[in-house]
Curated annotation (Swiss-Prot):
Cellular component annotations (GO), alphabetically ordered: cytoplasm
Isomerase is among the record's keywords: no
Enzyme Commission number: 6.1.1.21
MF (Gene Ontology): ATP binding; histidine-tRNA ligase activity
Alphabetic keyword roster: Aminoacyl-tRNA synthetase, ATP-binding, Cytoplasm, Ligase, Nucleotide-binding, Protein biosynthesis
EC class name: ligase
Full protein name: Histidine--tRNA ligase
The protein's assembly and partners: Homodimer.
PANTHER family registered for this protein in UniProt: HISTIDINE--TRNA LIGASE, MITOCHONDRIAL-RELATED (PTHR43707:SF1), HISTIDYL-TRNA SYNTHETASE (PTHR43707)
Length: 416
């Protein structure tokens, strides 16, 4: 039997999970202060959901999805991103009928067949927020500010917002046509995939990793030059809110993001703390996505980040400090003292982690357990307990003392 695991997945062992708890708890506490509520959607959906929403010309749909057929021949896909499932839940449950503004966040595993590298896996975990029902520019600012506040709460340094506007259904067609005309000049050097994108969605060529295409992108038309008055006004207001909040940003005219549904505001948050520029968060508006799925006209926007990548960055910056309650080991001399040991353990667990020994093992064996568990203290439950006396040993310094207790609750705070 092969006890290995497929490439691109990992076990998250107990010594790593405190990092995950820190990020997840920080997100929940902060997002809920901004009136976001948690949503949990299935990890697999009908494949059509992602083809229609994420976009059939995106790298995700064309190259990276884990798609399979169930026993009845229906095409299912492990979710490669979180937004389509949230929109599907919004429509299927008719949330729009009772909730004009819906603010949700999600935390969970996603799946993409891409080349594994540091901080990137084929099963990875995303944390994201979505807002449905608001088209005003302030909410664009709010989610960018929320992402920044979240990263700063985790003490991630040297953050910069890169922002752009892709326009709307009124002004986007002219930009698409300009892109198509520009790249058509170089059709002979485009890959087969990029030639297909040229005809179906030329914006996706801007995502191309083909080395022959990268220099061509430098002189490609920019969406900001094609914005209609409404989109210009919207974008200017977003930028003004960011200035008023003293959020530094850089307008990046070539930023388009890798998903087909984005409209107007798109952004990435990067950090340069590690030398090379690293994207940490990405997001934007998707004002037509709900309609794409057959729902009512509903503006929307959101952002997402990869938890594995964030943990890697925080570790490299030495920003993750995990503090766990002291571990107290209770060594039990005889079977008749087990009940009293249980009472002591119950009281101590108010403030500490507690591991119980066993009277069926010698004291020497129990102390070996305590050592291997890296215990901070050992409490000896022996004959002394009959006189309300406990011996406590600081397992780090070796210091010992006896304490007389009248009430087990006196043990809730041990100082030695």
């Amino acid at each position: 039997m092969n006890l290995g695991i497929p490439r691109g997945v990992q076990d998250i062992l107990p010594d790593e999970t405190p990092f995950w708890h820190l990020i997840e708890n920080t997100a929940r506490n902060l997002f809920e202060k901004y009136n976001y509520e948690e949503i949990r959607t299935p990890i697999f959906e009908f494949t059509e959901l992602f083809i229609k929403g994420t976009g059939e010309t995106t790298d995700i749909v064309m190259k990276e999805m884990y798609t399979f057929q169930d026993k009845k021949g229906r095409s299912l896909t492990l979710r490669p991103e979180g937004t389509p499932g949230v929109i599907r839940a919004y429509l299927m449950n008719k949330v729009y009928a009772t909730t004009p503004i819906w603010k949700v966040y999600y935390i969970g595993p996603m799946f993409r067949y891409e080349r594994p590298q540091a901080g990137r896996y084929r099963q990875f975990h995303q944390l994201g927020v979505e807002v449905l029902g608001r088209k005003d520019p302030y909410i664009d600012f709010e989610i960018i500010n929320l992402a920044i506040e979240f990263l700063k709460t985790l003490e991630l340094e040297n953050l910069e917002v890169e922002i752009n506007s892709l326009g709307c259904t009124k002004c986007r067609p002219a930009y698409r046509e300009a892109l198509k005309n520009y790249f058509s000049q170089y059709k002979d050097i485009l890959s087969h995939i990029d030639q297909e994108r040229l005809e179906r969605n030329p914006l996706r060529i801007l995502d191309s990793k083909d080395e022959k295409i990268i220099p061509l992108k430098e002189n490609a038309p920019q969406p900001l030059d094609f914005l209609c008055d409404d989109c210009k006004n919207h974008f200017e207001k977003v930028l003004n809110y960011m200035k008023e909040a003293d959020l530094s940003f850089k307008i990046s005219p070539k930023l388009v993001r890798g998903l087909d549904y984005y409209t107007r505001t798109v952004f990435e948050i990067t950090t340069t703390s590690l030398g090379a520029q690293n994207a940490v968060v990405g997001g934007g508006r998707y004002d037509n996505l709900v309609e794409t799925y057959g729902g009512p006209s509903t503006p929307g926007l959101g952002f997402a980040l990869g938890i594995e990548r964030l943990i890697l960055l925080l570790k490299q910056q030495n920003k993750i400090k995990i503090e766990r309650p002291s571990l107290i080991f209770i060594a039990i001399e005889k079977e008749k003292y087990v009940k009293k040991a249980m009472e002591i353990a119950k009281t101590l667990r108010t403030n500490y982690r507690v591991e119980m020994g066993s009277p069926e093992e010698s004291l020497r064996t129990q102390l070996k357990w305590a050592d291997k568990l890296n215990s901070d203290y050992v409490i000896f439950v022996n004959q002394g307990i009959e006189n309300n006396i406990l011996k406590i040993k600081n397992f780090k310094t070796g210091e010992e003392k006896e304490i007389k207790i009248k009430d087990i609750k006196e043990l809730q705070h041990i100082v030695l």
